[in-house]
Amino acid sequence: MIGILKTSLQNNDKDFFTIHNINKLTSTNTTSCIFCDNIDPNFILPIKATVLQRANAFDFRGMLITDELVRAQDLINITYPKKRFLYLYHLEWPHITELKFTHIQRILLNDNIELIARSNSHAELIEHLFKKPKYIMPEWDYKTLIEINQNE
């Protein structure tokens, strides 16, 4: 089972592709759910997967994936997931003023968190700065999510 950990779902490209591909998973044998605290009432897509409060992620035992650096700090403290992944969808860390490089290192070099890159060029940069991403997944591709679920 794949769990997606998010603060909220907003009308942006990242969340659109998240839900678009999670919805595609509902017609496969790969089960999924979303842990988040807020969904924009004007969110453009219907959500076909189970949505739970973010606090429920602390009891989750499947593959847990987040695409938010802030939530990746939670991944370090969530005890039960089978595997933890940080999907670096946007390389946004230079633009987050309150996030220091030491915080980023603690997350991106953590042995318990695997990295997922959005493209080959992102993967090369991430590997050069931190460690090699385990997967490359363009725009939350549901086929890659199935592969992660099967391989891990």
Go through each PLM region and give its residues:
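Extended catalytic core of nucleotide-activated donor transferases of GT-like folds
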Residues: 41-109
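A short, active-site helix/loop in glycosyltransferases that binds the activated sugar's phosphate group
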Residues: 74, 111-135
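A polyampholytic, Gly/Pro-enriched intrinsically disordered region
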Residues: 107-113, 152
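Histidine-centered beta-alpha loop that forms part of the nucleotide-sugar donor binding/catalytic region
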Residues: 7, 88-92, 138-140
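Hydrophobic anchor at the start of a short beta-strand
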Residues: 2, 30-33, 83-85, 132-137
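Short internal beta-strands
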Residues: 31-37, 87-88, 116-118
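Acidic anion/phosphate-binding donor-loop and adjacent secondary structure
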Residues: 93-99, 140-152
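N-terminal pre-catalytic "stem/leader" segment of glycosyltransferase-like enzymes
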Residues: 1-60, 145-152
